[in-house]
């Protein structure tokens, strides 16, 4: 499937908000109470929050396009934008999401490969991420890409304290 990747700018905030809310909800609705989900989506994907993240020089967002449709997106962090500091000289893969109708077509690999290329081009020694302990499909995806579990942390969704596994890959 032909695709292109392009950086997200503040002009794209409405589309970023739309795909962020949609893909997070689809992915985590089965595990999350409705009130907790609504609170998380309203807080973490608020327009001002997303603009601040886009403008942060240590965070970068990218859209994956199939034709003229936004199929998915990616967010990577370095430096103080990272949620944890597992290793020096690391890149955090904070978000990698595809819309449901674009899953299982190899596009997750396209986004992942793009993130890894960024890390390698910037001479990072490691990539890391957090993955929900109940998100088995994502765990298998990251294992296939060479990640190993090295710890865990709490990820708060509304009032729900969920456990994310911390995964690390040496580059």
List each model region and its residues:
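Short acidic-aromatic loop segments in the C-terminal HATPase_c
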Residues: 97, 147-148
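Short coil/turn segments at alpha/beta junctions that flank glycine-rich nucleotide-binding fingerprints
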Residues: 105, 122-125
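Acetyl-CoA-dependent GNAT
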Residues: 7-13, 17-30, 38-101, 112-114, ...
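Active-site acidic-Proline motif in GNAT/NAT acetyltransferases
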Residues: 99-101, 105, 133-134
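Conserved acetyl-CoA-binding loop-helix of GNAT-fold acetyltransferases
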Residues: 104-117, 140-144
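Extreme N-terminal starter segment of soluble prokaryotic enzymes
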Residues: 2-4
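C-terminal "cap" of GNAT-fold acetyltransferases
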Residues: 87-91, 125-139, 143-145, 152-171
């Amino acid at each position: 499937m032909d695709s292109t990747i392009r950086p997200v700018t503040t002009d794209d905030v409405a589309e970023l908000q739309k795909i962020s809310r949609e893909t997070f909800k689809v992915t985590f609705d089965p595990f999350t109470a409705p009130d907790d989900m609504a609170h998380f989506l309203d807080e973490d994907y608020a327009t001002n929050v997303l603009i601040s993240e886009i403008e942060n020089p240590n965070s970068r967002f990218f859209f994956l396009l199939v034709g003229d449709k936004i199929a998915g997106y990616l967010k990577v962090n370095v430096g103080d934008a990272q949620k944890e500091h597992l290793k020096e000289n690391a890149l955090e893969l904070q978000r990698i999401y595809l819309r449901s109708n674009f899953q299982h077509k190899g596009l997750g690999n396209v986004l992942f490969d793009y993130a890894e290329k960024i890390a390698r081009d910037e001479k990072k020694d490691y990539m890391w991420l957090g993955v929900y302990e109940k998100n088995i499909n994502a765990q298998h995806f990251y294992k296939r890409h060479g990640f190993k579990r090295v710890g865990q942390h709490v990820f708060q969704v509304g009032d729900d304290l969920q456990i994310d596994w911390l995964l690390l890959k040496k580059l």
